[in-house]
Amino acid sequence: MGSLVLPLSAVFCLVAHSASGSPIMGLEQSPLEEDMPFFDDIFTEQDGIDFNTLLQSMKNEFLKTLNLSDIPVQDTGRVDPPEYMLELYNKFATDRTSMPSANIIRSFKNEDLFSQPVTFNGLRKYPLLFNVSIPHHEEVVMAELRLYTLVQRDRMMYDGVDRKITIFEVLESADGSEEERSMLVLVSTEIYGTNSEWETFDVTDATRRWQKSGPSTHQLEIHIESRQNQAEDTGRGQLEIDMSAQNKHDPLLVVFSDDQSNDKEQKEELNELITHEQDLDLDSDAFFSGPDEEALLQMRSNMIDDSSARIRRNAKGNYCKKTPLYIDFKEIGWDSWIIAPPGYEAYECRGVCNYPLAEHLTPTKHAIIQALVHLKNSQKASKACCVPTKLDPISILYLDKGVVTYKFKYEGMAVSECGCR
C-alpha cells in the first residue's frame, strides 16, 4: 500500500481526537457530526489502513520536519531554557512584523563545568567547551558567542574597567598531546566595562567550519588582559566572565541557520491538500465525460446565482467552515520537549460540501464535478471534502538532544482558510 500523506495540521487534529484523559476542546457536539464520520470511521472504510499506524506515521511526519527521528528523550526534571532564547521566542511570537535573521536558532551551553579560570601575569584564561551539531543541509547565517561580563570596580574612583578580550580556538595536535596544541584567534576586541552585562562575539566562520566536520566537541579559551601595565592597573577593578554552573548567565554559543525548506514545504502542503483527488477515477466508464471549459464556467455561474432553499439552509451552520481547535501539548504528552508555546489554536475544517458549492469555498473544477456526480448518484462518488486550503505557520521553542532550539516558521500548523476539494 502506498504511503498516505495528509497536511501537517491534521496530525494534531487526529491526536486531539484520540488523546485520552480530559478533552482538548470543551465544545458541544455539533449537529453536523451526524452527517460527518469521525477520523477512525473514515479510515476504517479504506481497505488496509490501520488508524493507529496512520496516527503514528503522521506523528513521525511532524518530527521529521523538525529533523527529529523520535520524540527527544529528556533528563528528568524541567530544563530551564537560556534567558536569551526565551526573549527571542517572546519577541517574535508577540510581534509578527519582526523577522529573525534565520528560520532556526540553536543555543549550545558550555559543557566544561569543572575547569576553573587561571590567572598568570595579569592574564586571565577561561576554558570553554561546546558540543556542536548542525545538519549539513542548513546554511549557517550567523553565530555568536555570548559572554556575561562581571565588572567589579570602585565606583568612586573609576568610571570603568578597560580590558582586551580575545577568543581562541584550541586546536588538537595530530597525536592528541596537549604540549603540541595550537591556538587560533577567532576574534579579539577591546571593552570598556562600566556595568555587568552581556557581550557578543562573532564566531560565524569557525562555526561554519565546525558544521562541515560533523557533530564534534570544540574547545575555546577566553583571554582577558588589561590594556595598562600591571602596575598602573592595580586597584582599578576587575572584569571577569560569569562561569557559575546552572546559572542564567552561562556562556552561550548561539547559531542562526536557515534550512531553506519554506518553498519546498509549501509545495508539499499544496500537494497534500489534493492527494485524495488523484485516487478518484473520472474516466468515461465510471462517470461521464466532463464538461468543456465553457460549460464548466456556466455551471459555476449557475451555482453562484442559485438562491435555493438548500443554500440558505446550508449557510445556517453545517456548511464547510473553519472552527476552533486548541491543541494543548501537555494533553498529548509533548510538553516534556516543547518548551513554548504550551499550546496553540490550530483550527480545523468542518462541515459538508454539498452541491452547489459556494464561491467562498474556492472549489476546484474537480470538486465541482465530484459534487455534481455525488448529487446525481451517491454510489459513484463521495462528497467533496472540507479541507484546509491555506495553512499558517507557528513559532516553536523545543529541546533537541538537550539543545534548546527555536524554529520561527514551522509550516502548516494552523488552518487559515477552508474549502471544498
UniProtKB/Swiss-Prot annotation:
Molecular function via GO: cytokine activity; growth factor activity; hormone activity; receptor serine/threonine kinase binding; telethonin binding
Localisation: Secreted
Residues that carry a glycan: 67, 131
UniProt keyword Disulfide bond present: yes
GO biological-process terms attached to the record: activin receptor signaling pathway; adult heart development; atrial cardiac muscle tissue morphogenesis; BMP signaling pathway; cardiac muscle cell proliferation; cell adhesion; heart development; heart trabecula formation
Assembly description: Homodimer; disulfide-linked. Interacts with FBN1 (via N-terminal domain) and FBN2. Interacts with ENG.
PANTHER family xrefs: BONE MORPHOGENETIC PROTEIN 10, TGF-BETA FAMILY
Name of this chain's protein: Bone morphogenetic protein 10
Organism, as annotated: Mus musculus
Gene assigned in the entry: Bmp10
